[in-house]
Amino acid sequence: MKLAFILDPLDSIKIGKDSSYAMMREAAVRHHQLYTLQQNDLAWKDHQVIGFARPLTLLDPPEGDHRWYEEGAIEEIPLSGFDAVLMRKDPPFDTEYIYSTYLLELAERQGAYVVNSPRGIRDHNEKLAITEFPRFTPPSLVTSQEQLILEFLAEHEDIILKPLDGMGGAGIFRIQNTDHNIGVIIETLTRYGTRTIMAQRFLPEIREGDKRILLIAGRPVDYALARIPKPGETRGNLAAGGTGVARPLSARDREIAEELGQILYARGLMLVGLDVIGNHLTEINVTSPTGMREISDQTGTNVAGLMIDALEQNIARKNR
């Protein structure tokens, strides 16, 4: 197979924990051809969507985060010329990201197979998407109005505020009704009422970990990655200093995953990361879900292998 990965700059990838690297490594073991692009390598030219792609060879063994690959010369290739195009660009989900999804959707119409679906990515903001599944979510509020946030705080006394377009725990604040800088935090996050944010009731179960549950082709991986906050921190994100511990799915984890899995897969979302704190769904990650390496290293489950298995099966069905 000929696979194209749309990624952040390769030198920014930490191969010891990066899920895109895990998938590329698994694909290389199976002798699939690898190509990489960045977001700005996509173009509409001569009535088709093309990519300025570089052939990628993975070094075996890798020699660290900055010496694990070799790239060939740039090739101009229609996206329909790949067996699959995997969109793995990290947020922020800004206007450039949106434009990329439009180009990728055009490529789909020309026969390209894009994972995850560009429309699916665009339609599922990673914070807002949980509002479709209220029976699994904590009390939540989406607004730019300070008064509504203050009323929500008065009701729940201890809440989390987060931007709708962040990642890795960036811009997340916990506030309690006894704090003295509440107004400043709200003004900063909402940019004086001009930016919509999400508020959620604080879940003390975060101390036991913010669980990342991976869905592959609608089915949950048997282990979640519980991201445990460092002392004094309320964010479990690994980027915020959390520690990842693989754990078997609980009955509630599986209930959430199995209900959402087939719904999201039917929308073209083949690889999804659900974030669950305690018994509550807090986010649905569809851009570039992570956690494969940590789960695989700790449990022996080849998560990237499950993903490439599913990808091969879907490509075979598409080509029949």
UniProtKB/Swiss-Prot annotation:
<dbReference type="Pfam" id="PF02951">
    <property type="entry name" value="GSH-S_N"/>
</dbReference>
<dbReference type="GO" id="GO:0046872">
    <property type="term" value="F:metal ion binding"/>
</dbReference>
<dbReference type="GO" id="GO:0004363">
    <property type="term" value="F:glutathione synthase activity"/>
</dbReference>
<protein>
    <recommendedName>
        <fullName>Glutathione synthetase</fullName>
        <ecNumber>6.3.2.3</ecNumber>
    </recommendedName>
</protein>
<keyword id="KW-0460">Magnesium</keyword>
<dbReference type="InterPro" id="IPR006284">
    <property type="entry name" value="Glut_synth_pro"/>
</dbReference>
<dbReference type="InterPro" id="IPR016185">
    <property type="entry name" value="PreATP-grasp_dom_sf"/>
</dbReference>
<feature type="binding site">
    <location>
        <position position="285"/>
    </location>
    <ligand>
        <name>Mg(2+)</name>
    </ligand>
</feature>
<keyword id="KW-0479">Metal-binding</keyword>
<dbReference type="InterPro" id="IPR011761">
    <property type="entry name" value="ATP-grasp"/>
</dbReference>
<comment type="pathway">
    <text>Sulfur metabolism; glutathione biosynthesis; glutathione from L-cysteine and L-glutamate: step 2/2.</text>
</comment>
<keyword id="KW-0317">Glutathione biosynthesis</keyword>
<feature type="binding site">
    <location>
        <position position="283"/>
    </location>
    <ligand>
        <name>Mg(2+)</name>
    </ligand>
</feature>
<dbReference type="GO" id="GO:0005524">
    <property type="term" value="F:ATP binding"/>
</dbReference>
<dbReference type="InterPro" id="IPR004218">
    <property type="entry name" value="GSHS_ATP-bd"/>
</dbReference>
<feature type="domain" description="ATP-grasp">
    <location>
        <begin position="127"/>
        <end position="312"/>
    </location>
</feature>
<dbReference type="InterPro" id="IPR013815">
    <property type="entry name" value="ATP_grasp_subdomain_1"/>
</dbReference>
<dbReference type="Pfam" id="PF02955">
    <property type="entry name" value="GSH-S_ATP"/>
</dbReference>
<keyword id="KW-0436">Ligase</keyword>
<keyword id="KW-0464">Manganese</keyword>
<feature type="binding site">
    <location>
        <begin position="153"/>
        <end position="209"/>
    </location>
    <ligand>
        <name>ATP</name>
    </ligand>
</feature>
<dbReference type="InterPro" id="IPR004215">
    <property type="entry name" value="GSHS_N"/>
</dbReference>
<keyword id="KW-0547">Nucleotide-binding</keyword>
<comment type="similarity">
    <text>Belongs to the prokaryotic GSH synthase family.</text>
</comment>
<dbReference type="GO" id="GO:0005737">
    <property type="term" value="C:cytoplasm"/>
</dbReference>
<keyword id="KW-0067">ATP-binding</keyword>
